[in-house]
Amino acid sequence: MAERADLVFHNKAIDGTAMKRLISRLIDHFGMAYTSHILDQVKTLGFQQATTTSISLGIDDLLTIPSKGWLVQDAEQQSLILEKHHNYGNVHAVEKLRQSIEIWYATSEYLRQEMNPNFRMTDPSNPVHIMSFSGARGNASQVHQLVGMRGLMSDPQGQMIDLPIQSNLREGLSLTEYIISCYGARKGVVDTAVRTSDAGYLTRRLVEVVQHIVVRRTDCGTTRGISVSPRNGMITERIFIQTLIGRVLADDLYMGSRCIAIRNQDIGVGLVNRFITFRSQPISIRTPFTCRSTSWICRLCYGRSPTHGDLVELGEAVGIIAGQSIGEPGTQLTLRTFHTGGVFTGGTAEHVRAPDNGKIKFNEGLVYPTRTRHGYPAFLCYIDLSVTIEGPDILHNVNIPPKSFILVKNDQYVESEQVIAEIRAEASTLNFKERVRKHIYSDSEGEMHWSTAVYHAPEYTYGNVHLLPKTSHLWILSGVPQRSSIVPFSLHKDQDQINIHSLSAKQKFISNLSLSMTNDQVIKKLFRSDSSVKKGGWVLDYSGPAEVLCNGHCNLIYSAILDENSDLLAKRRRNRFTIPLQSNQEKEQKPRSGISIEIPINGLFRINSILAYFEDPRYRRKSSGITKYGTIEVDSIVKKEDLIEYRRTKEFRPKYQMKIDRFFFIPEEVHILPGSSSIMIRNNSIIGVDTRITFNIRSQVGGLVRVEKKKKKIELKIFSGNIYFPGETDPISWHSGILIPPGAGKKNSKESKKLKNGIYVQRITPTKKKYFVLVRPVVTYERADGINLAALFPQDPLQERDNVQLRVVNYILYGNGKPIRRISHTNIQLVRTCLVLNWDQDKKGSSIEEVRASFVEIKINALIRDFIKMDLVKYPISYTRKRNDPVGSGLIPVNGSDHTNLNPFYSKASIKQSLIRHQGTIRTLLNKNKECQSLITLSSSNCSRIDPFNRLKYHNNMIKKSNKRDILPPIRNLLGPLGIIPKITNFFSFYYLITHNQILVKKNSQLDNLKRTSPVLKYYLIDENGRIFNPDPSINMILNPFNWNWYFIHHDYCEETSTIINLGQFFCENVCISKSGPHLKSGQVLIVDVDSLVIRSAKPYLATPGATVHGHYGEILYEGDTLVTFIYEKSRSGDITQGLPKVEQVLEVRSIDSISMNLENRVEGWNERITRTLGIPWGFLIGAELTIAQSRISLVNKIQKVYRSQGVQIHNRHIEIIVRQITSKVLVSEDGMSNVFSPGELIGLLRAERTGRALEEAICYRAVLLGITRASLNTQSFISEASFQETARVLAKAALRGRIDWLKGLKENVVLGGMIPVGTGFKGLVHRLSNISLEIEKKNLFKGGMRDILFHHKELFDSCIPRNFPDTSEQLFTKQSFTRFTD
């Protein structure tokens, strides 16, 4: 040893890693014995110092970091903004999760970095600081949890809980934080126990597989090797050195013509350094993979022993060492897990900040727009980008590395220290990336819409899985789906309006509907047209048969009309819609009275048409049957003018006016079945109640069955009643189909009591000779005075000169003897009381045949009234119908001109005329104040509106502020038809006031802007086809509702721009659409009115390309249904507790990623591809070789990755020995001609090759990957197998097969108490082995062929190496060229 004076003196703190280096160098220089002596001295020194220091730890030593408060606040602020963006639909769930993780992770990391300087400055001798930062006890992560913040936790699956724990353990946790903390830490505590046993079991299995592998020869004579090349940057230098040191070269290595190293030379540090400096050609090394021996290994293929730096000794049990070296770190590391307590760890990106204030410039051609991982718009640069920032007095140049995100636009002004770019963190080999599926579930019930085209996923062409081609929103439009089990089909046609109480809504949704609606949300009348407009790309489809949607949050599907105290049912049939009225009080008193007002779609009433009708519940039946008027003749053809037209599609049928006191109804049960259905009862048989008729239909009454076939259907009727077999003299026998009214029977007969209701006699002849009489019960309906409908329309006291009259008429809806069919669960209305409209003809003879009716809504401050308005007026607008017009009649000015002619009262003279001419009627529909329901009649002469004067002053000021450009013009009288003031673009919005007193208000104040704007009368007309006549004076367009632009008039002042709103448009949260400020909820515009919108609330979900959408467009989703599935990459938690299962999965050859294919499947694919390329016999042999080599390298890399991520160094050799055992078997396939092995038998690869050589014919086999468990059960020794698992089965099989155990392994010998063939016990075997010569046989046909294939078809060979192996980027042996395949 050198003198002390010559030694270098280091004055440094030595930590763990420095200590490791020191020891390794000491061993290199001085050898083992001397090193141990030095280490003893170090140990003694350490213990002395620790004793004198005597560190103790108290709670006061935990000092919280001062900057923590504002850091946490800042992070909370960012999370809040993020949450908002998510609600607005700007970021999707995965982006939100990622970003919240990164926000909190960055905060936590920053606190962690602050910790050390903080301790150093405030209290350097703090025991916590000394202990943790010296590496003696505890680490930074634990101290950080004590004094910083606990941060994000991962749940037991290694997923992230996105609620961070902001407190540290010194401050104490809140209840929620404590629970989350336990949830995460449970993994630490419980799993440490569980995983320790796991790790032990893993070690046991590993040792089991390789226990028989012992070094038994010096050289096996193989010429194969695996080439490792340092040239490509995939392998880091450190890994490269680790791979090479201790190996043996498989081939001579030349540098130019000079040989640097020869075959079979072992590689030391010096040689490796020369390789790195020279960067010569790929280096071929021997590995356990290439060793030719079947069940052992040779010294040269193994290399140097890990214990001393020389070649491994003969007789060394390298298998057991390998198993232990892989299993042991697992046990160690599981014990080490609890220190983090489940705290999540991940990586963040670096940022580039602006050096100074100024304008930023870069070349826009070199970047292209993209979206960052957090959903922000950014530019991605492919190459180095030079960015200049023009400061106030200096130009700054910043270089941005390739693949970075630029977060600002070109020419944007940036502030100093603003983040301008984000450098992508290099995908380090330490964290795993795995592709995960994340399902997004719906928060609410509703109907699904998406705003872009979607593709069907190819494998689900007929399913409901769609792929998104571009980023777009999915919308869930709110609505309560109705789950109806009873109705097999819906009564409601597409686009019908449905009442909440409608018949098919069997469950009562009424209870949980809060029909709270504010006034501006009252839904306007909008009846969509029948045909969908295909051209514009809108298809309004009906979402299934029995789904009825209704919802209480004022979001009515298909804009059903609702108000606070009435449910209006608007059913739109082909040519009319009806609105039944009902008020709250009425609801409580009696079942729903169906007073309905009918208005034809074109809004035109003829004389004597029905205005309203009432369906009396007393005349309602639940069963099918026949109406009879009895013996009384019915005048079905009444006087011409009394005949009421009732049009239906094409069929014209009169309603039978009722002039009789009573009529009869004969009930019967009818089932109409498809022709193919099997009926379980016979014709003319008699059945009881609840008899099964078909598979799923049961009868509701008992009686006689009649079955008739009609076209393709079967009509099955069940008649209830009594059966008589009359004698021949009995008079009843001659009659069939006679109705006997009550009291007509003989007084003395027994039946007289039964005849109270009357009977119906029907003769039935089942066969020619037999007949009997069926006596059926009859229900009698007496004529009742229907509710006096006219009373519901009280005459207004001011309306003495009203010219509209109403009559009440009762109608029977079905003819004499007409069968009535009941369509699933509806009621049949037999009698309808109708209100017929009539009006006086004008005295001058200008007869008005049609009256136009429409709805008007009038506001009185906060009160809203709806009216039916009838105008006895011929408007200056005619209805035209174009042939190809899909929507129907539209409003078009008579002469097509846009402006002046539409104004009928341009001069004062015309105003007077129009007042006389335009008399009309308005009747209210709803009355909120009175208990009785009244419809007030108003005529145009006494209905006018007043503007609120108090707001005028305010607007006056407004105008003064705007430079007095518009001084208020003089007020002038204006009255339009029906007293409606034309609303010209004015400075304020109207409030409507209704007055019944003509004298009170004669003048209407209105800003006279007629001369300045185009003088067009501003009608607001929606005709019931959904056509709109646009009330904006400057634009006269006819818009159909599907692309319905509405110009929102901002009444405050004219300079303000107006938003364009389309019907059906979707709004995200917080979009400004009105002057009152941003709209707070997201939704879809349902109805647009002059001064209000109705928005159906909806929730947007953002989805990016490649996401999978579940469900169809317009499908009804329930809460918690899966909406979208995102596939995204996430870095796996670097905790070994998650790592160990990964190791185990690889070794057991189970699938690893949740998405990537199984390793086994991959091997199959390989086999097929190569066989296809090379033809059968060669294909099998080479295929098996290549497949096995390929999968071996992949497996080694996968396992190394887990351990390296934990900073554990395991030499590749150990893993290779294990992997060699997993992959050393092949499966004999049926294609072989030889009878040596049976198909499906597992044999060793080398054995298969040798047998093939001996037989001189090819054995066909393919590679399989066995897991370690299967490999342990497929060894050559049945004793070893039996001692591992399934003892009885293994021994029984071995006995039946007559297997022989050659006792080559360790375990068999231990079990039988023999000498184990390793170490000294091995020496006895050596003399037996020395006779075996290593001479190489002469090359036979196969080898020559093999060499030819591999060397003369280089490109073919390359094409076989797959490009799609998952880990190729980080593969250690990136070139897997086998230098030679010949032996």
From Swiss-Prot:
<dbReference type="InterPro" id="IPR012756">
    <property type="entry name" value="DNA-dir_RpoC2_beta_pp"/>
</dbReference>
<keyword id="KW-0934">Plastid</keyword>
<dbReference type="InterPro" id="IPR007081">
    <property type="entry name" value="RNA_pol_Rpb1_5"/>
</dbReference>
<keyword id="KW-0150">Chloroplast</keyword>
<dbReference type="GO" id="GO:0003677">
    <property type="term" value="F:DNA binding"/>
</dbReference>
<keyword id="KW-0862">Zinc</keyword>
<protein>
    <recommendedName>
        <fullName>DNA-directed RNA polymerase subunit beta''</fullName>
        <ecNumber>2.7.7.6</ecNumber>
    </recommendedName>
</protein>
<keyword id="KW-0804">Transcription</keyword>
<dbReference type="Pfam" id="PF04998">
    <property type="entry name" value="RNA_pol_Rpb1_5"/>
</dbReference>
<keyword id="KW-0479">Metal-binding</keyword>
<dbReference type="GO" id="GO:0000428">
    <property type="term" value="C:DNA-directed RNA polymerase complex"/>
</dbReference>
<feature type="binding site">
    <location>
        <position position="298"/>
    </location>
    <ligand>
        <name>Zn(2+)</name>
    </ligand>
</feature>
<dbReference type="GO" id="GO:0005739">
    <property type="term" value="C:mitochondrion"/>
</dbReference>
<dbReference type="GO" id="GO:0003899">
    <property type="term" value="F:DNA-directed RNA polymerase activity"/>
</dbReference>
<dbReference type="Pfam" id="PF05000">
    <property type="entry name" value="RNA_pol_Rpb1_4"/>
</dbReference>
<dbReference type="InterPro" id="IPR042102">
    <property type="entry name" value="RNA_pol_Rpb1_3_sf"/>
</dbReference>
<dbReference type="InterPro" id="IPR007083">
    <property type="entry name" value="RNA_pol_Rpb1_4"/>
</dbReference>
<dbReference type="InterPro" id="IPR038120">
    <property type="entry name" value="Rpb1_funnel_sf"/>
</dbReference>
<dbReference type="GO" id="GO:0009507">
    <property type="term" value="C:chloroplast"/>
</dbReference>
<dbReference type="GO" id="GO:0008270">
    <property type="term" value="F:zinc ion binding"/>
</dbReference>
<feature type="binding site">
    <location>
        <position position="301"/>
    </location>
    <ligand>
        <name>Zn(2+)</name>
    </ligand>
</feature>
<feature type="binding site">
    <location>
        <position position="220"/>
    </location>
    <ligand>
        <name>Zn(2+)</name>
    </ligand>
</feature>
<dbReference type="InterPro" id="IPR050254">
    <property type="entry name" value="RNA_pol_beta''_euk"/>
</dbReference>
<keyword id="KW-0808">Transferase</keyword>
<comment type="subunit">
    <text>In plastids the minimal PEP RNA polymerase catalytic core is composed of four subunits: alpha, beta, beta', and beta''. When a (nuclear-encoded) sigma factor is associated with the core the holoenzyme is formed, which can initiate transcription.</text>
</comment>
<keyword id="KW-0548">Nucleotidyltransferase</keyword>
<keyword id="KW-0240">DNA-directed RNA polymerase</keyword>
<comment type="function">
    <text>DNA-dependent RNA polymerase catalyzes the transcription of DNA into RNA using the four ribonucleoside triphosphates as substrates.</text>
</comment>
<comment type="similarity">
    <text>Belongs to the RNA polymerase beta' chain family. RpoC2 subfamily.</text>
</comment>
<dbReference type="GO" id="GO:0006351">
    <property type="term" value="P:DNA-templated transcription"/>
</dbReference>
<feature type="binding site">
    <location>
        <position position="291"/>
    </location>
    <ligand>
        <name>Zn(2+)</name>
    </ligand>
</feature>
